[in-house]
A protein has these predicted regions:
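N-terminal Rossmann-like NAD(P)+-binding subdomain of aldehyde/semialdehyde dehydrogenases
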Residues: 1-110, 137
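NAD(P)-dependent aldehyde/semialdehyde dehydrogenase
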Residues: 84, 97, 268-378
C-alpha cells in the first residue's frame, strides 16, 4: 500500500459522514440526489472532456470495442444518467420500513426494521455510469461509499466524484459520503480489501478476474456480482420470429454488458426453420459465430452468409464471457441436454428459453439455478431499471444477502427493536 494512503482515515471520515446521513429524512436524501442530477448536466462539458481523454488512451492501448463502448460517454448518455437519478428519487425509501413485527407472549413489541449498511466499498472496472449509480443508490439508502473504478476511466471517474461531492456539500452534508481511492490505483483497491471494520461490505463489479481477486483476497465481507456467461435456448416448437428477435437483441443491443447473451443453444428440431435465419441476421450484424459441427454444417448451406465469421467452437468458447461481437452456438437433442450444458458452463447470471410449451418453461426454470430466468424474453432484461428497481449497484450471483439485481433494499440491513414496559426475561 502506498505510504500516502491511510484507508482507515478515509473510512473514519466516511463513518462520521454516514452517521449524519442515517438520521436524515427521505426528503433530505432525495434533495442530495436532485442536486447530483442537476450537477451532472451542468458539468456535462467538463465530464465529456475527461472522458474523451480516457477513451483516446483506451483505444491507443487496443482496448476491445465493446469495452470502449462501456467506457464512452456522450451528452445523451450523461442526460440518461441524470434522468436515472431522478428515477431513484421516485423510488420508495427502504430506510425505516418494517420487515416484520408483532407482540410476543411476554407482551414485548418486536419490530424488524431496514437500516443502512454503513460504509460500502465498490471496486469496479471502466464503467463511469457505475460511479454515479453506486453513489446515488448508497446515498438514498443512507450509506457512505468509497469507490475504486478501473484505471481506464480514472479521469472520468475523478471528475464525476468531484461533481458529486460538490453537489453533496452544497446542501450542507459532508462530501466524505462519497470518496475515491482511484489516485492510489491498485494499492487503493488492495487497501479497501483489507479495511475490515472500516468498510462494512465490499461489492466488486466487473470481469471474472477482478471478482475472483476480491472474493479470494478480501477480509471485508463481499457481495459477489458474477460474470455474465448468459445462455439463450431455443426449444422445439418455439416461435421462430420471436426467437430470432430475442437472440439478436440479447447478443447485439449492447455487447459489453453482463446480461448480453454469450451462448445460443438450439434444439435439433429447430435447425431447419430457425438456425439459418438466426445465423444470417447475426452475421449481418457482424457477430462472429463459434459453432459446433451441426451449426457449421447448417451455415455452409446458408446463402449470402459471410463464412469468414464462422469458426469451430472450442471447449473454452462455452466458458467465455466474450463482451464482444462473438457468440458460441451449439445444437442440442433435447431440453435436458440444454439444461445440462447450462449447468456445466453458466456463471449463474441469466438464462433464457424461447418456447411454446408451459411444461418446458417450467422444467427450464426449475432445473437451472441462476439468478434470473427469462421465458420468451431477452437476457437484457436482467437490469434494475428494467425490473422496476431503478438503477442497480450490481447483479449478485451469490445466494447470501442478495441475489439478482441489487437495488435500494439490498443496500440495507436490518435492526431489531424490542420494546417493553420494564420487561425482564424469566
Amino acid at each position: 500500500m502506498s505510504n500516502d494512503l491511510d484507508i482507515f482515515e478515509l473510512t473514519d471520515r466516511a463513518k462520521r459522514a454516514q452517521r449524519a446521513l442515517a438520521t436524515s429524512t427521505t426528503a433530505q436524501r432525495n434533495g442530495i440526489l436532485l442536486a447530483i442530477s442537476r450537477a451532472l448536466v451542468d458539468h456535462c462539458e467538463q465530464i465529456l472532456h475527461a472522458n474523451a481523454q480516457d477513451c483516446q488512451c483506451a483505444e491507443e492501448r487496443g482496448m476491445a470495442a465493446g469495452l470502449v463502448d462501456r467506457l464512452r460517454l456522450d451528452e445523451a448518455r450523461i442526460r440518461a444518467i441524470s434522468s436515472a437519478v431522478l428515477d431513484v428519487i421516485a423510488l420508495e425509501d427502504p430506510v425505516g420500513t418494517v420487515i416484520r413485527g408483532g407482540r410476543t407472549d411476554d407482551g414485548l413489541r418486536v419490530t424488524q426494521l431496514r437500516v443502512p449498511m454503513g460504509v460500502i466499498g465498490m471496486i469496479y472496472e471502466a464503467r463511469p455510469n457505475v460511479t454515479v449509480d453506486a453513489s446515488i443508490l448508497c446515498l438514498k439508502a443512507g450509506n457512505a461509499v468509497i469507490l475504486r473504478g478501473g484505471s481506464a476511466a480514472q479521469d472520468t471517474n475523478e471528475t464525476l466524484v468531484a461533481v458529486i461531492r460538490e453537489a453533496i456539500d452544497s446542501l450542507g452534508f459532508s462530501a466524505d459520503l462519497v470518496q475515491t481511492v482511484d489516485p492510489w490505483g491498485r494499492d487503493g483497491a488492495r487497501a479497501m480489501m483489507r479495511a475490515r471494520g472500516g468498510i462494512d461490505v465490499l461489492i466488486p463489479r466487473g470481469g471474472e478476474g477482478l471478482i475472483r481477486t476480491v472474493v479470494e483476497e478480501s477480509t471485508v465481507p463481499v457481495i459477489e456480482t458474477g460474470t455474465g456467461n448468459c445462455h439463450v435456448y431455443v426449444d422445439s416448437g418455439a416461435d421462430v420470429d420471436a426467437a430470432v428477435r430475442i437472440i439478436i437483441n440479447a447478443k447485439t443491443q449492447r455487447v459489453g454488458v453482463c446480461n448480453a447473451a454469450e451462448t445460443l443453444l438450439v434444439h435439433r428440431d429447430m435447425v431447419p426453420s430457425f438456425l439459418p435465419q438466426a445465423l444470417a441476421e447475426l452475421t449481418r450484424a457482424g457477430v462472429r459465430i463459434h459453432a459446433d459441427t451441426a451449426v457449421r454444417e447448417c451455415a455452409a448451406h446458408v446463402g449470402n452468409l459471410d463464412q469468414s465469421l464462422i469458426s469451430e467452437a472450442t471447449e473454452d468458447d462455452w466458458r467465455t464471457e466474450y463482451l464482444s461481437m462473438d457468440l458460441a452456438v451449439k445444437v442440442v437433442d433435447s431440453i435436458e441436454e440444454a439444461v445440462e450444458h447450462i449447468r456445466r458452463y453458466s456463471s449463474g447470471h441469466t438464462e433464457a428459453i424461447c418456447t411454446a410449451s408451459i411444461s418446458a418453461a417450467n422444467y427450464f426454470r426449475s432445473n437451472i439455478d441462476s439468478a434470473a430466468i427469462a421465458v420468451n424474453a431477452s437476457t437484457r432484461f436482467t437490469d434494475g431499471g428494467q425490473l422496476g428497481l431503478g438503477a442497480e449497484i450490481g447483479i449478485s450471483t451469490q445466494k447470501l444477502h442478495a441475489r439478482g439485481p441489487m437495488g435500494l433494499a439490498e443496500l440495507t440491513t436490518s435492526q431489531w427493536v424490542i420494546e417493553g414496559d420494564g420487561a425482564v426475561r424469566k
